[in-house]
Structures are given as C-alpha cells and as structure tokens.
C-alpha cells in the first residue's frame, strides 16, 4: 500500500504527516484552498470503537458523531489506503477544525467523522494538495474516480459524493 504515497506525491500531494503530529502543530499546512486525503497504510483489518474521539457537532444542538460498529464495517473498503477525501477553501483552517473535532472538541466539521471511531485514528496520515480550481469540484472528481475503481463504494468516511 505504500506505493499510494508515491502516486499521490506525483499528483502534487504533500504532507503525509500523522494525525498525532498534526494535532500538535499545523504550521506546515498551507492556508491556500485545496483537497486533502486521510490514509491508513496498515494491511490489518481496522479495529472500530463504539465511542470514538470525535467531538459533538454544534454547541446549541449537539449531535452525537458515533455510529454503530455494523455501519462502520459496511462502509469499510478492504485493501484500500484512502479512507477520506475532503475539500477546503483554506487547508489550514479546515484541517484544524477536523483535527479539533477528532480531539473531542466542538467543531464545524461533521464530514469524515467515521475516522474518529478507528482505534488507530491518530496514526493515520494526512496529505493535501493546493488547487486553483474549485475544491468542491476537485473533491467530487476524486470521489467519482474512487467509486469507479471500487465498485461504486466511496472512501470509508465519505458519506456523500
């Protein structure tokens, strides 16, 4: 699965930093618009948590980010390193919000929340790519390509196209 890093680097992605390290410092992340990918490079089956580390979405009417283990299993794409594709008008801001959510804090980042029910979520790698194009369009194209290669399945934590 490590050849995925070389493929992504050749496509302009950079970073490849663990969630754990990015939670400590996000200085190296660009403020530019772009797309980002969360990778799990382990070949082993994932261990899912009943209660993940994700925070609750919105302070006024908090929503529980956790779903059943069965739902997580249903969404898992076997033998695939890419587990989430996201978009950002500011990579630093969006990834910051995503990581704060993963630390159990209130955040405005509901997408990709299944990540935080993985026991090894802090070991996952994050990479990103700046783009002059509309990040949402780039994200949609990337998800469409992923689905084409995986029998119609989205990356594990992508709940919409």
Language-model-detected regions and their locations in the chain:
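An exposure/low-complexity boundary signal
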Residues: 96-106, 127, 141-148
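Coupling/hinge elements of helicase-like and P-loop NTPase modules
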Residues: 148-159
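Generic surface-pattern signal
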Residues: 10-13, 100, 120, 147
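Alpha-helix boundary/interfacial micro-motifs
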Residues: 50-51, 103-106, 156
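GIY-YIG nuclease catalytic motif and its immediate N-terminal context
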Residues: 1-93, 126-143, 159-161
């Amino acid at each position: 699965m490590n050849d995925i890093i070389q493929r992504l680097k050749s496509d302009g992605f950079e970073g490849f930093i663990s969630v754990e390290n990015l939670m400590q410092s996000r200085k190296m992340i660009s403020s530019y618009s772009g797309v980002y990918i969360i990778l799990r490079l382990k070949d082993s089956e994932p261990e899912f948590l009943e209660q993940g580390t994700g925070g609750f979405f919105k302070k006024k009417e908090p929503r529980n980010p956790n779903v059943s283990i069965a739902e997580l299993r249903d969404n898992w794409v076997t033998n695939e390193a890419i587990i989430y594709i996201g978009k950002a008008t500011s990579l630093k801001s969006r990834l910051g919000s995503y990581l704060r959510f993963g630390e159990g804090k209130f955040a405005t980042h509901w997408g990709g929340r299944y990540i935080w029910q993985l026991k090894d979520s802090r070991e996952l790698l994050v990479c990103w790519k700046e783009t002059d194009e509309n990040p949402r369009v780039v994200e949609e194209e990337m998800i469409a390509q992923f689905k084409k290669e995986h029998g119609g399945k989205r990356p594990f934590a992508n709940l919409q196209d």
